Swiss-Prot record:
Membrane topology summary: Multi-pass membrane protein
InterPro entries on file: Lactate_perm
Entry keyword annotation includes Transport: yes
Superkingdom field: Bacteria
Disruption phenotype: Cells lacking this gene are markedly impaired (but not totally blocked) in growth on L-lactate minimal medium but not impaired in growth on glucose minimal medium.
Function: Is the principal permease for the uptake of L-lactate in B.subtilis.
Name listed for the protein in its UniProt record: L-lactate permease
Lineage: Bacteria, Bacillati, Bacillota, Bacilli, Bacillales
Entry GO terms, CC: plasma membrane
Keywords: Cell membrane, Membrane, Transmembrane, Transmembrane helix, Transport
PANTHER family: GLYCOLATE PERMEASE GLCA-RELATED, L-LACTATE PERMEASE
Pfam families xref list: Lactate_perm
Keyword Repeat: no
Protein family: Belongs to the lactate permease family.
Length: 563
């Protein structure tokens, strides 16, 4: 039996309905920021509240609400949970085999300054992984690397989440941009160009902002040349590639150029003082001794290459998985004539499952009268997590770890991540209930009431969408058309508003419940999600304000920037 979404369930009053829809979100903020609940407790409680409001206020049939939660939970397991397990597993292999000691030494040979390490790994390397894979892999891997180098786990997770602001809109080979073309009818290239005229301002600023968070303004000024090289190289390539190539490659190209530029720059420039966190002076002294003492072990190029091989394999596998024709074959949707890809397509088809969600698939009708498809999307071979697992299998032979130890490390990883994965499953379940019940649309419609000030508040929709769904792609699909319709009604260029949805969304990623859960899982802070949320929330709001100002100015003052 079909059920039609109602966006004003409380007496036809939009504002009252919006207040009801806000309850789960306000509770989640309160649970983490004030009550400091454990992530899985807050996630499950928020899901429960969302289910109650969906059923009692929005009159959503109980079985449909419950099945919507299961749809989200399954997505939380695959691909998101699977990516986290395999990412942490690969990192643990390098630790178990002693290869991470060599990785640490190789990074220290470039710089043992914590500020510069954050720029190289959190900002540049994290952006590369975002462009190649997305879905939590960038924060999980880069944060684990920073912890291995000696960063405080909370700082590592927080810094990587904030650094991930710059690349999110073009993540996973540009999917957030290409996906929104369908519901809006606006060419992806135009949206790519507009986003590429907004985010470079953030990309220049984020490296400086990261270092200020880490060390304060005065310490940040000590390395301003390196910050400039990192941010400007990234921003320039991001602008050029998004405006002249399209949405697929800005992250990958920007990250590679930024990483290479900074590494080369550090060959001939060093900061006057080496920054380390408070409390690590003793270890810092031993690091300096090891770095300058000729008797300390000096690793050869071959040893360094071997140590980095697991992550080089990860990069290669994720990059291959992101190639459109390969990705199509991995999920059984390839229609070309290449022999190998046709064979891969046959395998991928057998390992891709899309069963309809019982009581839900095409059983919910939106305001336009269109039934909404609801399937359990299980792409076993096509998941980036599988690419990382293959890298872990190949790394077994390179690192010479026994199959027994390899299996033991995998079991330990799964055991450690049980509660974080429960957190992820519950918060994604909450996101799906919010969407399928119509609550998220109610909130979007309420923001659209801001009228002429919508030119300022437009990015807030994207921020809200990413907070709810954990994905810039999902936020664009959720609010993209609403952005277009509202923009036309208030005299705003829809290209700007849809781009602002994506640009605003990137600032919400660092406080998204699933992002918080992923980051905590990667650095061993399960149960400490509230601490990380309190760390990132103020930065999220500040960066959102910057995007709102940029969008407002581009409409009223710099309209020539709109393609």
């Amino acid at each position: 039996m079909q059920w039609t979404q109602a966006y004003t369930p409380i007496g036809g009053n939009l504002l009252l309905s919006a207040l009801a829809a806000l309850v789960p979100i306000i509770f989640f903020f309160w649970a983490l920021a004030i009550k400091r609940m454990k992530g899985y407790t807050a996630g499950l409680a928020t899901l429960g509240i969302a289910l109650i409001i969906a059923v009692l206020v929005y009159r959503m049939p109980a079985e449909k609400a419950l099945m919507s939660a299961t749809q989200g939970a399954v997505y939380g397991l695959l691909p998101i949970g699977w990516i986290i397990v395999t990412s942490v597993f690969l990192y643990k292999i390098t630790v178990k085999t002693g290869q991470f000691d060599i990785i640490r030494s190789s990074v220290l040979s470039i710089t043992d300054d914590r500020r510069l390490q954050a720029l190289l790994i959190a900002f540049s390397f994290g952006a590369f992984l975002e462009g190649a894979a997305g879905f939590g892999a960038p924060v999980a891997i880069s944060a684990a690397l920073l912890v291995g180098l000696g960063f405080n786990p909370l700082y590592a997770a927080g810094i990587c989440l904030i650094a991930n602001t710059a690349p999110v809109a073009f993540g996973a080979i540009g999917i957030p941009i290409t996906a929104v073309e369908g519901p809006t009818g606006i060419p992806a290239m135009e949206i790519s160009q507009m986003v590429g005229r907004q985010l470079p301002f953030l990309s220049v600023f984020i490296p400086l902002y990261l270092i200020i968070i880490m060390s304060g303004f005065r310490k940040a000024l000590e390395i301003w040349p390196a910050i400039l090289v990192s941010g400007v190289s990234f921003a320039v390539v991001q602008y050029l590639s998004s405006n002249f190539l399209g949405p697929e490659l800005p992250d990958v190209l920007s990250a590679l150029v930024s990483m290479a530029a900074l590494a080369v720059f550090l060959k001939w420039w060093k900061p006057k003082t080496t920054f380390r966190f408070a409390g690590e002076q003793e270890s810092a002294a031993s690091i300096e001794t090891a770095r300058t003492n000729p008797a300390a072990p000096a690793y050869r190029g071959g040893q360094i290459f071997k140590a980095w091989s697991p992550f080089l394999l990860l990069t290669a596998m994720i990059s291959v998985w992101g190639i459109p024709s390969v990705k199509s074959a991995l999920t059984g949707h390839y229609e070309g004539s290449a022999v190998f890809l046709k064979w891969l397509n046959a395998v991928g088809e057998k390992l891709t499952f899309s069963p309809g969600v019982p009581f839900l698939n095409n059983q919910i009708v939106n305001a336009d009268g269109t039934p909404i498809e609801a399937v359990y999307k299980l792409e076993v071979l096509g998941s980036a997590g599988t690419a990382i697992l293959i890298a872990a299998v190949l790394s077994k032979f390179i690192t010479a770890i026994s199959w027994k130890d390899w299996g033991t490390v995998f079991k330990e990883t799964v055991q450690e991540l049980k509660l974080p994965i429960l957190t992820i499953a519950s918060v994604v379940g909450f996101a799906y209930v919010t969407n399928s019940s119509g609550m998220s649309t109610t909130l979007g419609m309420t923001l659209a009431l801001t009228g002429s000030m919508f030119t300022f508040f437009s990015p807030v929709l994207g921020w809200l969408g990413v907070f709810i769904t954990g994905s810039d792609t999902s936020a664009n699909l959720l609010f993209g058309n609403l952005q277009k319709v509202t923009a036309l009604s208030v005299g705003m260029d829809p290209v700007l508003s849809v781009a602002a949805n994506s640009s605003g969304g990137v600032t919400g990623k660092m406080i998204s419940p699933q992002s918080i859960a992923v980051a905590c899982a990667a650095v061993g802070l399960a149960g400490k999600e509230s601490d990380l949320f309190r760390f990132t929330i103020k930065h999220s709001l500040f960066l959102l304000l910057l995007v709102c100002i940029i969008t407002f100015l581009q409409h009223h003052v710099f309209s020539w920037m709109i393609p």
